[in-house]
C-alpha cells in the first residue's frame, strides 16, 4: 500500500501508463474486428447492438460506479502495513462491493423488459433475439460478481493486474464475436459471398455480440477469482461475503462505514443525472432518430472517440483514483500535489485538443473511407464525423475537470452539483428538441446539443477549481491560475498559423499526398508543443520509472 502523496502519485503515473496500454490493446483488437465486421453488417445491425451495449453499460453504471467512487474514501492507516487496520479497510471495501449485485440484478430485468416493449417489431422477431437479451443479462450478473475483487485491486492501486485482466477479457469477447459470425458466413451461409438469408444473418450478428459480452464477463470473473485464490486467499485479510467490521474508536461493529455510506448516497444521486447527460444522446437517438442513424452514431462513437478512450479515459480514471486516495488525508502538502497534477494535465489536454480541432475535421472523412464498406457509402457518416471532431475536446476536458471535482468536493458540494445536473438535463433535452425536431439537423443537432451541455459543465467545474485554487494559495503571491498557462500563448499563435496554412493550401484531404502533408504539419506542431513543455515531460518520465512499492 502507498502511504505518502509522492508514492501515490508515482504509482498512479505508472497506473495511467498501464491503463493506456490496456486500452490500446483492447481498442486495437476491437478496431481490427470492427473493420472486418463493418463490411458484412448493415447500419441497422450496429443500431441494435448499440442498444444492447447501452442496456449493459447503463445497468453496470448505476449498479457499481457510485460504490467504486465511495470506497476510495475509506480512510487508510497510512503505514502501508498488513495488520488489523489493513484487513478492516479491505473488508469494508468488500462489504460495499457486494451492493452492486443487489442493485444490478433487479435493475437489469426491469430495464430489459421496459426497453424490449419499446423496440421495433423487426428486431424482436429476429432469430435468437430473445436469447441475446438473456445472454446480455447473464453477462451483467457475471461482471457484477467480480466487483468485490475489482474493488480490492482498485483500493490497492493494482493497475497492472487490472489492465492485464481487462485486456484478456476484451480479446476473449472479440474472438467469440468474430468466430460466431465467421462460422456462420463460411459454413452456414455459403462463403460469405452471397447472402442467402439476410434476416437470419442479422439475428446471428446480434447473437454473436451477446456471446461476446458473456465471454468478456466470464473471463474477467475467472481471472480475478484465480488471482484471489493464488495471492490473497491464504492471507485471510478479508472475506468475500458480508462481514461486520469494528467501528474505529468504538466497541461496536458494522457492515458499512457511516461516512462512506453517506458519501455513496450523495454520489449516487449525482451520478444518476450525470449518466443521463453522458448517455442522454443514446436515449435521444432511440426516440428521435431512425435505426440507420443510430447505427451511424454508433460508428461515429467507435471511430471518432478512439483517442478519447485510449488516452483521455485512462488518464481521467487514474486521476480520480489518485486524488481520492491522496485526499483521504487532506494535508496541505497533498492539496498542493493534487493542484500541480491538475494544472499539468489540463495543459496536456489543451495541446491535444488543439491538434484534434486543427487536423480532425480535414482528415477524418478521408481516413474513414478506407475503414467502411459500400453499405455505408449512401449515409451521411463522412460529413457527420467532421462535426464530431469538434465535440471530442469538450468531452475530454469535461472528463478531467469533473474527475477533479468528484475527488476534492465535499458531500454538500456534490449534492449542489447534482441539482445542476438536474437543470442541465432539462437544457439538454430542450436543445435536442430545438436542433432535431425544429431545425431537422439530425445527428449534427445531437452533437451541437452535447457541445452546449459539455460547455456548461466545464464552466461550472472551472469556477469551482478557480475558487479552490485561490483558497489553497491564499497565503501566496500566486493566487491566479492564469499564470500557470502563460506559456500557451505562443503555441496558440502557432496553431492559428498552421490551421490557416493547412486550410488555405489543402482544405479537406482528398489523397495520400495531402494526408502526408497533414501528418508532417501535425508532427511539427506536436514537437513544438513538446519543446514548450520539456521540463514537464522530463518530470513525467522520472515519475513513470518503477518505484520500490510492493504491489499485490
Swiss-Prot record:
Where it sits in the cell: the answer is: Endoplasmic reticulum membrane
Membrane-crossing segments per the record: 18-38, 42-62, 94-114, 126-146, 168-188, 203-223, 341-361, 389-409, 419-439, 491-511, 512-532
Q: Among its keywords, does the record have Iron?
A: no
The family database entries (InterPro entries) matched by this protein are listed as: RFT1
Q: Kindly state one GO CC term assigned in the UniProt record.
A: endoplasmic reticulum membrane
Membrane topology value: Multi-pass membrane protein
State the Gene Ontology terms under molecular function: flippase activity
Biological process per Gene Ontology, one example term: protein N-linked glycosylation
- State the similarity comment: Belongs to the RFT1 family.
What protein is this chain from?
A: Man(5)GlcNAc(2)-PP-dolichol translocation protein RFT1
Phylogenetic classification of the source organism: Eukaryota, Fungi, Dikarya, Ascomycota, Saccharomycotina
List the gene name: RFT1
